[in-house]
Curated annotation (Swiss-Prot):
Transporter that mediates cellular uptake of betaine and GABA in a sodium- and chloride-dependent process. May have a role in regulation of GABAergic transmission in the brain through the reuptake of GABA into presynaptic terminals, as well as in osmotic regulation. Probably also involved in renal and hepatic osmotic regulation. It catalyses: 4-aminobutanoate(out) + chloride(out) + 3 Na(+)(out) = 4-aminobutanoate(in) + chloride(in) + 3 Na(+)(in); glycine betaine(out) + 2 chloride(out) + 3 Na(+)(out) = glycine betaine(in) + 2 chloride(in) + 3 Na(+)(in). The chain crosses the membrane at residues 45-65, 73-92, 117-137, 211-229, 238-255, 291-308, 320-341, 374-393, 423-441, 458-478, 499-518, 538-556. This is Sodium- and chloride-dependent betaine transporter. The keyword Nuclease does not apply. Belongs to the sodium:neurotransmitter symporter (SNF) (TC 2.A.22) family. SLC6A12 subfamily.
């Protein structure tokens, strides 16, 4: 179509835009986005990320760390890491995905081929998470089904799995719910270890398969499969329920918790500041690792979820809002947890230090014990485990979606064909389920602890975070990435973010990583069982299998490249030319919020800037 523009001789000068290769690449990018799929609206993205990052660690890890590390004083190192590491790295990963429209592996390959190993390392961590994280859902489902009885089975000592050492009330000092005296154990502990786990003497004896847990695990995988099998447009609808329902449960449990006798004392223990604890480096390490755990940083999930955003989505504002939402949820969850623990402390007549637990001990020992002391105990048990299931469910299927995204983006020709995605998801689910059966054997808890302590540890995440921020801020260029972000959102983010990328984040992460190594202590199950030497070797193999991806990929890339070392290095730090390039401003003082990218699909072959201020 021939377009003629009649312009008055006194009118402002016209600037014609001749379509070049960059516009063709942009059009190809739009077509690729259609092939990959995009979020229907911003809320789907926000809820999907919220579902991923707001999980079990918000409920069972943060409150205990806060109590253990000086109460309110713990917020000092927590918020230092929050602003200097949490928000900057979180935003970096989301912006990287949105800018490249690629999953974790191919995003790093396009922006800085030398550091493609960062993406591969995140895929390794995602794979481990897909195997072991869902085991928690199987346990929670087992407890939920066990709650539909006239009397909760962990209330009494008259069940077939109880031993002669079971004692219904351990009120005396030194016999809390998670501990045992020389001769006695509690019914809730025996239900957990003998009925649910059937735990053996050690990792050398895996024992038989716990078929009830295997069925619960199968149910969890079936639900996860159907939550993501049709792509992000379908997943975006699922998270409207799975990401919001836990908040309803949290509010109900909060109201119930703060109305219990003894709740005030528990909350005081949770928040009472002990500033002397800030002298302990362990407090700072716990704050840093908690930020990386709860924000799902360096796991590839944020990059994958961001890749389904529209190019001009304001990912900066979204990232800040999601980070604050995550921390606020952790803070509120602390009131739920410690109001109940305060109630337990008063009912049993023991110090709160003897009932305070973290991790599985809180979810499957402390809380089940607490609900037995409440009226309508079956109701509160059901509500609590439903909340746990939904907190874990969306974290699990979103993590699964991110692994699928990375795989499809690596092999688009093979896996983007009709029906291939569903088969890929099915294959991954079946494989992870079969491997997961090892974790629901009678000795499976020992394997679970290895995964949790080594495979997805803070050491791995801190290691990868250093390479992430260094590759973007120092190799690709912080100013260049800021230009890309400005092209996407229309303005440049707060300068502190760039300063953090350049100095604060790599410095703090490296210091915390080195301190974590220096303070390393071998895993002990229940602080008692010592693993055999080969067990620790397996654990460190799980840890190094992800971290080793970065240096190995650097070496392999340098060996495969052609030319001198300098030429090879230059090739490997050069971004892919197909990436969107910031457009040149055709005005002198026009607003920063305007979209400066020409769209040949919408404007035709000639784009005319009718108004200038020249």
């Amino acid at each position: 179509m021939d377009t003629k523009l009649a312009v008055h001789e006194d009118a402002p000068p016209l600037v014609s835009w001749v379509p070049e290769e960059g516009e063709k690449l942009e059009q190809e990018g739009e077509d690729q986005a259609k092939d990959r799929g995009q979020w229907t609206n911003k809320m789907e993205f926000v809820l999907s990320v919220a579902g991923e990052i707001i999980g079990l660690s918000n409920v069972w890890r943060f409150p205990y760390l806060c109590y253990k590390n000086g109460g309110g004083a713990f917020f000092v190192p927590y918020f230092i890491f929050f602003f200097s590491c949490g928000i900057p790295v979180f935003f970096l990963e989301v912006a990287l995905g949105q800018y490249t429209s690629q999953g974790s592996v191919t995003a790093w390959k396009k922006i800085c081929p030398l550091f493609q190993g960062i993406g591969l390392a995140s895929v390794v961590i995602e794979s481990y998470l897909n195997v072991y994280y869902i085991i928690i859902l199987a346990w929670a489902l087992f407890y939920l089904f066990s709650s539909f009885t006239s009397e909760l089975p962990w209330t009494t000592c008259t069940n077939s799995w109880n031993t002669e050492y079971c004692q219904h009330a351990l009120n005396h000092s030194g016999a809390g719910i998670g501990s045992s005296t020389e001769n006695f154990t509690s019914p809730v502990m025996e239900f957990w270890e003998r009925r649910v786990l059937g735990i053996t003497a050690g990792i050398h004896d895996l024992g038989a398969l716990r078929w009830e847990l295997a069925l619960c695990l199968l149910l969890a995988w079936i639900v996860c499969y159907f939550c993501i099998w049709k792509g992000v447009k379908y997943t975006g609808k699922v998270v409207y329920f799975t990401a919001t329902f836990p908040y309803l449960m949290l509010v109900i449990l909060l109201i119930r918790g703060v109305t219990l006798p003894g709740a005030y004392q528990g909350i005081v223990y949770y928040l009472k500041p002990d500033l002397l604890r800030l002298k302990d480096p362990q407090v700072w390490m716990d704050a840093g690792t908690q930020i990386f755990f709860s924000f799902a940083i360096c796991q590839g999930c944020l990059t994958a979820l961001g890749s389904y955003n529209k190019y001009h989505n304001n990912c900066y504002r979204d990232s800040i809002a999601l980070c604050f939402l995550n921390s606020a949820t952790s803070f509120v969850a602390g009131f739920v947890v410690f109001s109940v623990l305060g109630f337990m402390s008063q009912e049993q007549g023991v110090p709160i230090s003897e009932v305070a637990e973290s991790g599985p001990g809180l979810a499957f020992i402390a809380f089940p014990k607490a609900v037995t002391m409440m009226p309508l105990s079956q109701l509160w048990s059901c509500l609590f485990f439903i909340m746990l299931i939904f907190l874990g469910l969306d974290s699990q299927f979103v993590c699964m979606e991110c692994l699928v995204t990375a795989s499809v983006d690596m092999f688009p020709r093979q896996l983007r064909k009709s029906g291939r995605r569903e088969l890929l998801i099915l294959a991954i689910a079946v494989l992870c389920y079969l491997i997961g059966l090892l974790l629901v054997t009678e000795g499976g808890m020992y394997i679970f602890q290895l995964f949790d302590y080594y495979a997805c540890s803070g050491i791995c995440l801190l290691f990868l975070s250093v390479f992430e921020v260094v590759s973007i801020s120092w190799v690709y260029g912080a100013d260049r990435f800021y230009d890309n972000i400005q092209d996407m959102i229309g303005y440049r983010p707060w300068p502190l973010v760039k300063i953090s990328w350049l100095f604060l984040t790599p410095g703090l992460c490296l210091a915390t990583f080195l301190f974590s190594l220096s303070k390393y202590s071998p895993l002990r199950y229940n602080n008692v069982y010592v693993y055999p030497a080969w067990g620790y070797c397996v654990g460190w193999f799980l840890a190094f299998s992800s971290m080793a991806c970065v240096p190995l990929c650097i070496v392999i890339a340098l060996l495969k490249a052609q030319g001198s070392f300098t030429k090879r290095l230059r090739q490997l730090i050069t971004p892919d030319p197909s990436l969107p390039q910031p457009t040149q401003q055709l005005r002198l003082d026009s607003g920063p919020g305007q979209d400066r990218r020409p769209s040949p699909a919408k404007e035709g072959l000639v784009t005319v800037e009718k108004e200038t201020h020249l």
